[in-house]
Amino acid sequence: MTTRRTFRWPSLLTESGRGIAFGGDYNPDQWPEETLDEDIRLMVQAGVNTVALAIFSWDKIEPREGEFTFEWLDHVIDKLGAASIAVDLASATATAPLWLYERHPEVLPIDRYGHVVNAGSRQSWQPTSPVFKEYALRLCRRLAE
């Protein structure tokens, strides 16, 4: 990421006197960029003060193996911050990118009948996969930088 934030969640809520976090998951990477300002306006109107962000965003953060792009995420975080909406940044590992499944099909889960479950839904990976763990940790480290 290009910008360091000066606050730590949840101190933003308690220090501002706004109390409990109110909001939900926000997935702006799944919608056209033009909806961002309207989404934020409606969040402010509804009293939203916190969103969980980047839950399903691995493929947007790392569109190709080893190529990371955080500009869009920085932009969204900055816009939310300007509206006093705190961000609970997710690990972005709920859904892995297609390139990971194509290179490492062994990360796909196997159902109770021994059938490989295809990619395309949330958490369609084996939690015990050392390959998945390696890639997920790399992503999380980059997010933390």
What are these regions (language model features)?
Residues T2-D37, R41-N49:
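An acidic-aromatic substrate-binding cleft motif
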Residues T3-R4, S11-L13, G17-R18, F22, ...:
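Residue-level signal for the start and early helices of compact helical domains
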Residues S11, D37-R112, R141-A144:
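Aromatic-lined substrate-binding rim segments of carbohydrate-active enzymes
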Residues S16, M43, P127, A144-E145:
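Structural motif
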Residues A21-E33, A54-L73, V116-R138, A144:
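The substrate-binding groove and active-site-proximal loops of carbohydrate-active enzymes
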